[in-house]
Amino acid sequence: MTVLERLAATVEARKGADPDSSWTAKLLAKGPEKCAEKFGEEAVEAIIEAVRGDRARLASEAADVLYHLLVMLAARDVTLAEVMAVLEAREGTSGIAEKAGRG
């Protein structure tokens, strides 16, 4: 199991936890919209670090983005496995062709 898979499992396990006991549970309790908002905030922070060129800070912000992506997905009951299946289906397909095929 990869670090990302373990993190996804932890996020999933926190879905029913007491919001006072876990940051993840607290975010999930606020609903999908708040989870999406937080993901967007973290994505913007990663973009800023990418523009600045600070590799260490970009890596840190990218980790935050991945975590908040998993929380946002969990809030809508979308699993990491579902996302990975989509990526696997796209593997080996030109990005241009894949996008055109979406219709």
Curated annotation (Swiss-Prot):
The entry assigns this protein to a family as follows:
Belongs to the PRA-PH family.
Q: In which pathway does it act?
A: Amino-acid biosynthesis; L-histidine biosynthesis; L-histidine from 5-phospho-alpha-D-ribose 1-diphosphate: step 2/9
Please name one Pfam family that this protein belongs to: PRA-PH
Query: Where does it localize?
Result: Cytoplasm
Amino-acid biosynthesis keyword on record: yes
Q: Which domain of life is it from?
A: Bacteria
Q: Which protein is depicted?
A: Phosphoribosyl-ATP pyrophosphatase
Q: Which organism is it from?
A: Cereibacter sphaeroides (strain ATCC 17029 / ATH 2.4.9)
The enzyme's first-digit EC class, named in words, is hydrolase
What are the EC numbers? 3.6.1.31
Q: Which terms in the GO cellular component ontology are assigned?
A: cytoplasm
The protein's annotated catalytic reaction(s) are:
1-(5-phospho-beta-D-ribosyl)-ATP + H2O = 1-(5-phospho-beta-D-ribosyl)-5'-AMP + diphosphate + H(+)
Return the Gene3D superfamilies for the record.
MazG-like
Q: Keyword annotations for this protein? A: Amino-acid biosynthesis, ATP-binding, Cytoplasm, Histidine biosynthesis, Hydrolase, Nucleotide-binding
Q: Which one of the record's GO molecular function terms can you name?
A: phosphoribosyl-ATP diphosphatase activity
Q: Which SUPFAM superfamilies match?
A: all-alpha NTP pyrophosphatases (SSF101386)
Please give the chief subcellular localization of this protein: cytoplasm
